[in-house]
From Swiss-Prot:
<dbReference type="Pfam" id="PF02746">
    <property type="entry name" value="MR_MLE_N"/>
</dbReference>
<keyword id="KW-0456">Lyase</keyword>
<keyword id="KW-0479">Metal-binding</keyword>
<comment type="pathway">
    <text>Carbohydrate acid metabolism; D-galactonate degradation; D-glyceraldehyde 3-phosphate and pyruvate from D-galactonate: step 1/3.</text>
</comment>
<comment type="function">
    <text>Catalyzes the dehydration of D-galactonate to 2-keto-3-deoxy-D-galactonate.</text>
</comment>
<dbReference type="InterPro" id="IPR013342">
    <property type="entry name" value="Mandelate_racemase_C"/>
</dbReference>
<feature type="binding site">
    <location>
        <position position="183"/>
    </location>
    <ligand>
        <name>Mg(2+)</name>
    </ligand>
</feature>
<dbReference type="InterPro" id="IPR029065">
    <property type="entry name" value="Enolase_C-like"/>
</dbReference>
<feature type="active site" description="Proton donor">
    <location>
        <position position="185"/>
    </location>
</feature>
<dbReference type="GO" id="GO:0008869">
    <property type="term" value="F:galactonate dehydratase activity"/>
</dbReference>
<feature type="site" description="Increases basicity of active site His">
    <location>
        <position position="258"/>
    </location>
</feature>
<dbReference type="GO" id="GO:0000287">
    <property type="term" value="F:magnesium ion binding"/>
</dbReference>
<dbReference type="InterPro" id="IPR018110">
    <property type="entry name" value="Mandel_Rmase/mucon_lact_enz_CS"/>
</dbReference>
<dbReference type="InterPro" id="IPR034593">
    <property type="entry name" value="DgoD-like"/>
</dbReference>
<feature type="binding site">
    <location>
        <position position="235"/>
    </location>
    <ligand>
        <name>Mg(2+)</name>
    </ligand>
</feature>
<feature type="active site" description="Proton acceptor">
    <location>
        <position position="285"/>
    </location>
</feature>
<comment type="similarity">
    <text>Belongs to the mandelate racemase/muconate lactonizing enzyme family. GalD subfamily.</text>
</comment>
Length: 382
């Protein structure tokens, strides 16, 4: 079997799909994208195609190593996201060729179901509470919420009090009937992160995500040492070499590699195994589309240290398309009591509505994250 063609489709809301075709008619799908930089990743995918077209798709490891090591400069979000989508599509082809789900190729199931959690946004506590109520009605009991707005390197007690008040209202409204993680989104610098984490402890969040940026990872063990709340990070780490450093330094209780940013299934399977040796949990980052989610689930079902899976159903970013809009076999993604179950179709287990993908790709827009500024005009982290 030989790879004959690679086609990309940028799609609403902010996704990109990759179709890899073969001379035997087997097609694989991947989701290579960086939110807000889809065109850059698209260019990288097509640049890398010269190493892929004409190759045997079964040689996933060799293709991955060629894409990663074939250039003197490597790593980073654009290249690793391009590799990730190609890798996902190759696993999809291999599973389809052999007639088995990808998790069977990775050693088989280690669990029967995986808990899903849902992101809940809202500018007011009442909006967040209403969003949680709606999701609990369909079986969710675990959520992720924004931990704070933008915050200066040294900021006021008023900012801290405002962030804590929101969390307090949510905990008061639901008690221990729900669990929620708090995402600082890398908006907070270390001095304020120390204060904010301490003030949030009475409300027992499930985890604190990205309390500081990955570039400031030396603070993860320092912050972890001062709190009993698990620290999570990893969506802006792009290879096992990035994770090697933070795992060796300690501090993280949960790693969150993104299967569409961190080299795909091949790389994230290794990252998960490496984390297990440090007794660190896995919770793949996934605010993206159905192919990315399927890739995450295949790793979740073979990694013993996987604890829960993010998914983007109803997320506020999904303007113009929902999670399963481009999927034919929607029922295969059905959750029961807030859990996903193994996908049973060969490959990634996602049947893509290609006709709709082609049509909607004509309506793609260039999504950009907001640019926030402090009152003094300086750019803030979003």
């Amino acid at each position: 079997m030989k790879i004959t063609k690679m086609t990309t489709y940028r799609l609403p809301p902010r996704w990109m799909f990759l179709k890899i075709e073969t001379d035997e008619g087997i097609v694989g799908w991947g989701e290579p994208v960086i939110e807000g930089r889809a065109r850059s990743v698209e260019a990288a995918v097509h640049e890398l195609s010269e190493y892929v077209v004409g190759q045997d798709p079964a040689r996933i490891n060799d293709i991955w190593q060629t894409l990663y090591r074939g250039g003197f400069y490597r790593g980073g979000p654009i290249l690793m996201s391009a590799i990730a989508g190609i890798d996902q599509a190759l696993w999809d082809i291999k599973g389809k060729a052999l007639g088995v789900p990808v998790y069977q190729l990775l050693g088989g199931l280690v669990r029967d179901k995986i808990k899903a959690y849902s992101w809940v946004g809202g500018d007011r506590p009442s909006d967040v509470i209403a969003g949680i109520n709606k999701l609990t009605e369909i079986g969710f009991d675990t959520f992720k919420l924004n931990g704070c707005e933008e915050m200066g390197i040294i900021d006021s007690a008023r900012k801290v009090d405002a962030a804590v008040a929101v969390v307090a209202q949510i905990r008061e409204a639901f008690g221990n009937r729900i669990e929620f993680g708090l995402d600082f989104h890398g908006r907070v610098d270390a001095p304020m992160a120390k204060i904010l984490i301490k003030e949030l402890e009475p409300y027992r969040p499930l985890f604190i995500e990205e309390p500081v940026l990955a570039e400031q990872a030396e603070y993860y063990p320092r912050l972890a040492a001062q709190t009993h709340i698990p620290i999570a990070a990893g969506e802006r780490m792009y290879s096992r070499f990035d994770f090697k450093r933070v795992l060796a330094d300690g501090g993280l209780a949960i790693i969150q590699p993104d299967l569409s940013h961190a080299g795909g299934i091949t790389e994230c399977f290794k990252i998960a195994a490496m984390a297990e040796t440090y007794d660190v949990a896995l919770a793949p980052h996934c605010p993206l589309g159905p192919i990315a989610l399927a890739a995450c689930l295949h790793v979740d079902f073979v990694a013993r240290n996987a604890v829960f899976q993010e998914q983007s159903m109803g997320i506020h970013y999904n303007q113009g398309a929902e999670l399963l809009d481009y999927v034919v076999n929607k029922d295969d993604f059905k959750m029961t009591d807030g859990h996903f179950y193994p996908l049973t179709k060969p490959g990634l287990g996602v049947e893509i509505n290609e006709e709709l993908v082609i049509e909607r790709s004509k309506q793609a827009t260039d999504w950009r994250n907001p640019v926030w500024r402090y009152p003094d005009g300086a750019v803030a982290e979003w």
